[in-house]
Amino acid sequence: MGLSLLQDRMRGIMIQLQTKFSRQVDEHNVLPEYPRPSLVRTSYLNLNGRWECAFSKTPEIPLSFDLSILVPFSPECQLSGVSRQLKPGEYLWYRRTITLAKPQQDKRILLHFGAADQTAEVFVNRISAVRHCGGYLPFSADITDYL
């Protein structure tokens, strides 16, 4: 079931809207296209799909991630599977475990995000690799040295 969600903030009610797009979402193959078709790389891995997530009240990495979110959808959107808004003073954490082959000596591994809402800090193996501020702007991090 694919639904998008509109929240009426004035009355605090949730209205579910179904669209042609939302009905076609396949959680096992979410937006698989390369983001810049004219610049395709041969070693590209799309990380859209299910991620673990958690809401917390502290800036420390949570011990448990008790929710599942469908990336690239925002947590407020029903397509994400979360349908919850981040409250003031809360932190939203995403976690995804992947296994990568060690890159060749002259190669680097870049982690690219198409967007993040305002402030994001990326941890690789629990070490901060990059911090980004700027809502809905793309950013990248060279994570080779953190692997």
Label each region the model flagged.
Residues 1-13:
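N-terminal amphipathic/basic-hydrophobic helices that include classical n-h-c signal peptides
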Residues 39-48:
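N-terminal helix-cap/turn-to-beta initiation motif at the start of protein domains
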Residues 12-15, 19-23, 31-33, 37-38, ...:
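Accessory beta-strand-rich segments of carbohydrate-active enzymes
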Residues 66, 78-86:
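Histidine-centered catalytic/metal-coordination loop motif
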